[in-house]
Each structure stands twice: as C-alpha cells, then as structure tokens.
C-alpha cells in the first residue's frame, strides 16, 4: 500500500449521460457520464459496448448462482442492480521489470462491486492472499477468473469474503495484458444484509475490519471510496474536496 503501481490502463464505464452536479449532489454523481472514445479507433466503441453487455449477462448469471448458494431466490440482488447497474471495464497493460522501478503491478486490494469477471492473457502475475501469504492464480486458457467483491461480502455479512489480490510485475522483456470487468449495484442503492439459512448464518464471520478500507452499505459511497484510494493523483486534481486529511496527504505524496 502507498507504493506507485506500474501499469497502463484505459477505464471505460457505462455509456450514460452525466448527472447534474451542485453543492448538494451526492459525491457518486461524479462516477457517471459518457466515455471519451478515441477518434483514431472508430470501431472501439461498438466492440467495447458489446463486450460490456455480454460480461454483464455473465455477471448476472453468476450472481443468481451465488444467491441460490446462499439459500436465496435467484433474483434477490435485482432490487439493488436494476435498472442501471454500475460497472467498469479496464484494459490494462503491465510492462516487464526492465521498464519499471518496483515489482508492484497493482497493489493489494479488494474490488468494490458484486464481482469481477477477469479476462487475462497467458502471462502469470495475479496473486491472491491466503493465510497471511500469497498464492498464484495462473491463467487457464479459455476461462475467466471471478473475484468476489465487497457488495457480496456486505450482503452475506462476511460469509462470502471479497478476496484481497494483487498483480506482480512480469519478467523483463515481457508484458501482461488483462481486461477486468467490475459489475456492481446501482450507485443510489443500499446493500441489504441477507437472512441466511441457519447452517450458513452460523458460519458468517462478520465484515472485514480495515481502517484503511472501510466497507459501506451505501453503494455510491463505497465505489467513490475505492476510486479515491486507487487513483490518488486523479483524486487530488479533480476531487480534492472529497479527500479527508489522510487521503489528501497520500495523494500529495504521489502527485
């Protein structure tokens, strides 16, 4: 934590109109708006929007499976993601060690939404925290990696845990490409705590306690928290009014 990541990425959210902003607007209004499509790649918009639609459909199928595994109706989560789920696609390139200053491709973190659908190339680098250490999650051809996010941890009262993961820099002379799709609830929604069957409720662990990454049932607040933490230099430039003293100090250190 607190180290500079070594990666290049393009963030592409849901293609929607920007929301009005005034001093009384919720901070999460800033997370919604149209994307900036490069004129040099005229076909990019259509390809990305089709991929987002397909990844959303897959994420919803996974959510229905999680819901049933938790003893709930398959559509239990619809109330907080319809009609406009919040989602984000990233296209990420991690350069090799000969072009970076540290081994940190991206630091240890959790994903803030329901779940993440991760497409990656054949270059290893993804690691998941387990029992105080790190285990590799090597690529498997023809598959996606599914990460549990903070919304599922909140809804299940910790029965499901948002997994902490990171990416280490690939070897010199190589690079790593990945395309994570983060599927979340509506920004104006509040995450309910599900009434789990007794046999599952007895095994809940409560929410993870981390002063540097508190979990909020307010979906918009939880997403904004993650964005401010993930991109402190951007936060300082465009959202300094939202930073607390600790966040402001961290952002200034990376500016």
Name these PLM-found stretches.
Residues 1-3, 31, 42, 49-50, ...:
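C-terminal flanking tails of non-heme Fe-dependent oxygenases
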């Amino acid at each position: 934590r607190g180290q500079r990541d070594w990666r290049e990425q393009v963030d592409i959210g849901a293609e929607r109109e920007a929301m009005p902003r005034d001093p009384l607007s919720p901070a999460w209004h800033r997370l919604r708006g149209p994307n900036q499509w490069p004129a040099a790649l005229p076909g990019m918009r259509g390809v990305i929007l089709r991929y987002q639609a397909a990844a959303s459909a897959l994420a919803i199928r996974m959510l229905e499976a999680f819901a049933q595994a938790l003893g709930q109706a398959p559509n239990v989560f619809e109330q907080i993601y319809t009609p406009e789920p919040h989602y984000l696609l990233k296209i990420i390139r991690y350069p090799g060690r000969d072009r970076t200053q540290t081994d940190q491709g991206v630091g240890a973190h959790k994903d803030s939404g329901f779940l993440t659908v991760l497409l990656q190339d054949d270059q290893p680098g993804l690691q998941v925290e387990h029992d105080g250490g790190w285990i590799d999650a090597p690529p498997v051809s023809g598959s996606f990696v599914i990460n549990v996010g903070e919304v599922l941890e909140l809804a299940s009262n910790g029965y499901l845990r948002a997994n902490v993961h990171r990416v280490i820099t690939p070897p010199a002379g190589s690079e790593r490409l990945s395309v994570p799709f983060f599927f979340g609830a509506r920004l104006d929604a509040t995450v309910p705590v599900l009434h789990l069957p007794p046999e599952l409720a007895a095994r809940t662990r409560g929410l993870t306690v981390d002063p540097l990454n508190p979990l909020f049932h307010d979906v918009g607040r939880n997403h904004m928290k993650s964005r401010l933490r993930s991109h402190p230099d951007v936060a300082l430039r465009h959202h300094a009014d939202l930073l607390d003293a600790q966040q402001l100090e961290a952002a200034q250190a990376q500016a």
